[in-house]
Amino acid sequence: YLAHQLDLSLGALGLGTLDLFHLHNPEQQLAHLGPEAFYAAIQRAFEACEGFVAAGKIRAYGVATWNGFRVPPGQAGHLSLARLLNAAGGAGGRDHHFRWIQLPLNLAMPEAFLIPTQEVDGTVLTPLAAAQALGLQVQTSASIMQARILNQLPDGFAAAFGLRTPAQAALQFTRSCPGVSTALCGMGQAAHVAENIEVMALPKLAPEALGSLFG
């Protein structure tokens, strides 16, 4: 199945190699399989991905999640970054190509920045801090929540951060969170592209300023 989907993607894009290949929402299989069978299945999927790397079809792989890294241990759908890395090591050894994770992060869904859900060497860290500690790159999805949060921001919020629009302020929050490598944001108009490029020219907000937004 993974090989078929990868070949479809390569054909649709007209490419010979993808920079990154994500397994999408694997946590949806946890309830059906149970933890042990789930992580065994993940290792087999990672073995397939290592084969794709060896064949030159992808350069790296990861997991794109919605709930998996945000919910705490013991809650349905929780994914352990440490166990995923163990699976990657079993699939590809120390030089495995499991390099990225994706999770939602925005002003309305700040869990990845605020809530410790991942145990790393006996310490429970936020998903972003855990990814940093484990050497993983992070993409954020829903960085401005498909614009649904923009009308909920208080008057003057954008101006307080030296920005023109609520969308810029929302994106600046997400891209500034320590550990975020890439903040994904869909753009349907050229004007939105220009608006977001303005944000990229600014320095990121300090962690203290980010934390102050949540009291």
Q: Can you name each region flagged by the protein language model?
A:
Residues 7, 26-215:
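Beta/alpha (TIM)-barrel catalytic core signal, keyed to glycine-rich beta->alpha loops juxtaposed to Asp/Glu
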